[in-house]
């Protein structure tokens, strides 16, 4: 599997940044190529995207989620990928975000694109767009504050600002 790591800082409180990142259905607004993300339940998502000019769909499971700290996922079908997003408060108004993603390019075109740094560049663009989006708004559009461990929701928590 190929690995991408990106770290960036956002001029917003950690709860604002984390809450916005939990709004998976809004990912197409800042991720080029992602056409749709449907949240099926608290821990399952369905993705539809165009990758290297080819339509791809996959299902993903949130395997760990701790408010204001981290979200980890893995694909369960389709395009093979997994990753973690970590949120670290630097002060009351600034947050460091660390994104680690692993994926398996399939076929010649995807492998060639990977070698040329296309995926890394797309991820870089996505984090820059996310940063601009949340910094310009200064508030989240919603948030999911529940916890997930081992792919299962644990304890209280749920949607906010709906």
Residue ranges and their predicted role:
Residues 52-59, 105-109:
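Short, cysteine-centered beta-strand-loop-beta hairpins and adjacent loop/turn segments enriched
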Residues 39-46, 65-73:
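Short, hydrophobic/aromatic-rich segments at coil-to-beta transitions
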Residues 1-44, 129, 133-135, 149-162:
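Hydrophobic ligand-binding cavity/cleft-lining segments
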Residues 63-64, 74-132, 136, 141-143, ...:
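Beta-strand/loop substructures that line and gate deep hydrophobic ligand-binding cavities in soluble
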Residues 3-7, 44, 57, 70, ...:
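Intrinsic-disorder/low-complexity, polar/charged segments enriched in Ser/Thr/Lys/Arg/Asp/Glu/Gln
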Residues 1, 53-55, 78-80:
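Glycine-centered tight beta-turn/hairpin loop motif at sheet-sheet or coil-to-beta transitions
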């Amino acid at each position: 599997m190929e690995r991408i790591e990106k770290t960036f800082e956002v001029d917003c409180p950690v709860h604002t940044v984390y809450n916005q990142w939990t709004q998976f259905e809004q990912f197409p607004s800042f991720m080029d190529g992602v056409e749709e993300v449907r949240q099926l339940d608290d821990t399952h998502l369905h993705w539809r995207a165009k990758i290297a000019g080819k339509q791809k769909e996959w299902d993903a499971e949130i395997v760990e989620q701790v408010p204001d700290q981290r979200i980890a996922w893995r694909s369960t079908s389709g395009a093979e990928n997994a990753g973690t997003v970590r949120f670290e408060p630097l002060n009351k108004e600034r947050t460091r975000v660390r994104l680690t993603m692993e994926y398996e390019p399939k076929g010649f075109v995807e492998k060639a694109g990977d070698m040329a740094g296309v995926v890394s560049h797309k991820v870089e663009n996505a984090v820059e767009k996310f940063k601009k989006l949340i910094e310009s708004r200064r508030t989240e559009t919603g948030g999911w504050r529940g916890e997930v461990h081992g792919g299962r929701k644990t304890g209280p928590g749920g949607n906010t600002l709906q």
